[in-house]
Swiss-Prot record:
Annotated an anthocyanidin binding sites: 25, 404
InterPro entries found in the cross-reference section: UDP_glucos_trans
Annotated function: Iridoid glucosyltransferase acting exclusively on 7-deoxyloganetin. No activity with 7-deoxyloganetic acid.
Tissue: Expressed in roots.
Family: Belongs to the UDP-glycosyltransferase family.
EC number in record: 2.4.1.324
Catalytic activity line of the entry: 7-deoxyloganetin + UDP-alpha-D-glucose = 7-deoxyloganin + UDP + H(+)
Family annotation (CDD domains): GT1_Gtf-like (cd03784)
Protein's UniProt name: 7-deoxyloganetin glucosyltransferase
Amino acid sequence: MGSLSSSDYSKKPHAVCIPYPAQGHINPMLKLAKLLHYKGFHITFVNTEFNHKRLLKSRGSDSLKGLHSFQFKTIPDGLPPSDVDATQDIPSLCESTTTHCLVPFKQLLQKLNDTSSSEVPPVSCVVSDAVMSFTISAAQELDIPEVLFWTPSACGVLGYMHYAQLIDKGLTPLKDASYFSNGFLDQVLDWIPGMEGIRLRDLPTFLRTTNPDEYMIKFILQETERSKKASAIVLNTFQELESEVIDSLSTLLPPIYPIGPLQILQNQVDDESLKVLGSNLWKEEPECLEWLDTKDPNSVVYVNFGSITVMTNDQLIEFAWGLANSKQNFLWIIRPDLISGESSILGEEFVEETKERGLIASWCHQEQVINHPAIGGFLTHNGWNSTIESISSGVPMICWPFFAEQQTNCRFCCNKWGIGMEINSDVKRDEVESLVKELMVGEKGKEMKKKALEWKNIAEVTTTKPDGSSYSNLEKLIKVLKSKPSH
């Protein structure tokens, strides 16, 4: 620890960081934890036992040893044991964490605070994923601040915050299955401040149910209500990108600190020891970057549908031939569990047709890939991490949202920010081909690239300049984490 004596060390602030146990939530929480560590906090990072095992498998047995001042701990997720190397079922996971995780989390805090056996400073704050809000009662018992990190976009969170009103207005649950396709979802909602022109179909998709007892709706109502009890709310976005939405959210929630894009903030952390701490649950394939090194600038479409999206083999084949027929270079990440219930088979004809210009891999280091000069566009599911990383890199998008608030992100990318084109959910190869060509060599693609670079520039200013909004919000957040909560 360098020059810190043990008595000085025990006075360090100690943040316990606990992400929701899915890839897209672990990544941003680890970035935030590294930033806090860099700012002088001792960190305890809490994974579930299931994901801890997956990380050891993907990153090697030494990968979670951590540092003296950055430790990894685990709690059970309450689900039956499984060795499957795939994303867990989201509704089951939400129900299980809500029901089973509070007791082991409290026991962990107790152990960390046990002066007879613990060699770490007492826990002084909790930074929890907003959908792990059971942690609030543990923080209240210890009388320490609890900050909730909503990992979606601000526009996605604003959608969730209006679920109660959607129910009150009879807009969800849907009356019957015909409402999925009869135009009902196309109605414009003019009563959500900060979301002008938003349609029902653009809001997070859990409302698209005919089941009056839909668990995910109950879960969202519970989590959005509990968010009001936090000391503060953190978002991985920036004021300039979502100003109207953030202003609207500020009337509904405790103080909000947009501190994104986190990856640009984290790039300023000059600490080699932290760089070895990674969070990819699948093994990264370094040959992706080697292959990109052989390609011209802005000549490759990066294709990745994230860690949760699944598709049918027919959809996979339509995407494949759309990419092949576009004659553009592509790097396509196909997770082992991307095709629901079966393995993906693309066939020799496709491989032969694209061997000079296509590379398929099972996972990669996305930030390095998307920042590579060869990448000219991104075919994405519009998960928020992918979207904000694309914005930070100045890369325009083709959007194929799958679920949750990905629809909302797609709407804002295409209609508000000018950096995306949506592809029909019922994907056809001709549309894939024409959109990929437009993205890479068309006029609209050029306009979107220009706009994406403008957003990249704003994102860099807001995170790197002392008067930038995200830079100063991080400083304000640290003050909250070091303060005593006001009840």
